[in-house]
A protein has these predicted regions:
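Disulfide-rich, cysteine-dense extracellular ectodomains and adjacent flexible linkers of secreted
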Residues: 1-229
Length: 229
């Protein structure tokens, strides 16, 4: 458009003018600045719009990004809304950000529209921060479960002393076998050294008492006529 023209040019994509000029630029010098950028949470993907459209659920638009269009200063970020990233969702329209999944849950898809898209981590996994796109497998010696003391998927929990979990992503702990012990959070059980046996709950090794010796992980009385050496 040139000065003195009787016609108006349409506002570019990502901008709007308002109802007074029906989406066109003003007829005076400086008309290019009369088209405004869409506000946060809105966009325009057509020219000549009097208003901007709301971002749909699952999407957002924070601010307009600088760019260029047909030789004019443009607003590329206002031409479309962005998908909420993995680990996030948006259940409202015309929003300028997304809502994060809570600790212990995850969401592995973009543009999600409901809080129900955030799913609890499976057993043997946890999500220790908000907005998680995936869950982390519990390390050996730790676990999570469906119910009970280890069901909080916000973190993985140590197997109690006397138990162990060998692999990653464990959902249960196994009790130490005969003659073996473990501390809390251990991936395997260990044998007691000679002359010592496991205590009753397999959490520590204890010395055989005076007059007894260890044989096959059991403290036994020394036979009459024999000495402990």
């Amino acid at each position: 458009m040139v000065l003195g023209s009787l016609s108006c040019d349409k506002c570019k994509k990502g901008r709007y003018r308002g109802q007074s000029t029906q989406g066109s630029k003003a007829k005076v010098w400086g008309w290019e600045q009369s088209c405004q950028a869409c506000p946060s949470g809105k966009y325009s993907n057509q020219e000549g719009l009097a208003t901007c459209d709301d971002c749909a659920k699952g999407k957002y638009q924070t601010s307009c990004e600088a760019g260029s269009s047909d030789g004019f200063a443009g607003y590329a970020g206002c031409r479309q809304c962005k998908n909420c990233p993995k680990g996030w969702y948006q259940d409202g329209n015309a929003q300028d950000d997304c809502k994060h999944c809570a600790i212990g849950t995850y969401n592995d898809l973009t543009a999600q529209k409901q809080s129900s898209s955030c799913k609890a981590c499976p057993n043997g996994y946890s999500a220790g921060s908000t907005g998680s796109p995936s869950c982390d497998a519990c390390i050996p010696g730790q676990l999570t479960t469906t119910s009970g003391a280890f069901s909080d998927k916000k973190q993985c929990y140590n197997c109690p002393a006397g138990f162990s979990a060998v692999g990653h992503g464990s959902t249960s702990c196994a009790g130490c076998g005969s003659g073996k012990i473990s501390g809390a959070g251990e991936s395997s059980c260990s044998s007691c050294t000679a002359g010592r046996t496991p205590n009753s709950d397999s959490t520590a090794c204890v010395d055989c008492t005076s007059g007894k010796f260890e044989s096959n992980n059991v403290c036994q009385d020394c036979p009459e006529g024999n000495l402990i050496i």
